[in-house]
Amino acid sequence: MVRLFRNPIKCIFYRRSRKIQEKKLRKSLKKLNFYHPPEDCCQIYRLLENVPGGTYFITENMTNDLIMVVKDSVDKKIKSIKLYLHGSYIKIHQHYYINIYMYLMRYTQIYKYPLICFNKYYNI
């Protein structure tokens, strides 16, 4: 397997249909020293300043939407991208990609940062 980035992609997929799964997710995130509740926006902004570039998480919320937060390396603005799953393809801004690696290879100028989205799409 070819390693494309300094830090490997970490994906956490879950559904909030059961409390046991949510507890398991929180426990897993605490092991990674990464957990910020979505209602605490200040924590998210702090996280974006402190997390090393190239580390990011893709998370699935209860509506099967994938959310990825990115920070532009030029203007430093924080942007959120909504990913849609279509079979084995990912659709981002009307373009289809076989997997997330293909998207990241095309847009290498943005840093990837994590955000946990539990039940709705948050605009930052």
From Swiss-Prot:
Plays a role in virus cell tropism, and may be required for efficient virus replication in macrophages. Belongs to the asfivirus MGF 100 family. This is Protein MGF 100-1R.
